[in-house]
Amino acid sequence: HVGTTDNLMSCEEWDNECGKVYKGMIDAGVESVMIGHIRLPEYQRKLKPGIKDNEIMPATIAPELLQGLLREQLGFNGLIITDATHMVGLTSQIRREDMIPTTIAAGCDMILYYRDKDEDTQALKTGLEKGILTMERLDEAVTRVLAFKAMLKLHTKKANGTLIPPAEGLSVIGCDEH
């Protein structure tokens, strides 16, 4: 990617195409959604009347899309994960130190990839201090991550030694068939 992508569908087109797919998956019980660094200008204008063109951000940092469209309109209650945060579609829009707390504040629960764990942790702390992110929203995100891990039974798999598949299971990763 060399920049942020715009999905130029009208709201009606999006509802009848992408929206039906999302709603069908949500109704079928999908537990997580990965958010792309794509803008959806027509929907963003509908959900946030008066939004200026330069305020239309990629979905990853757009609360009107994450909370308004995905959670409220489509009824998704699972884990929202960012796409890779080092991609230009996002980094061209916001500095990393602001991106980290802004993604969580906007409605993402988990950030995919970190450049430097300590740096990103500090960015979250600074975001809390600056008011970019509230402790309530951070707690909500952490709760969703922990619930997702519990749903996958990661805690019991780690305890009984089955978290990492046996060697024969791992051997299929990267094999010619895959």
PLM feature segments, named:
Residues 1-126, 132-137:
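Second-shell residues forming the walls of enzyme active-site clefts
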Residues 152-177:
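A short C-terminal boundary segment appended to hydrolase-like catalytic domains
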Residues 129-157:
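Mid-to-C-terminal alpha-helical segments outside catalytic/metal-binding sites
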Residues 70, 74-75, 132, 146, ...:
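Generic low-polarity alpha-helical segments
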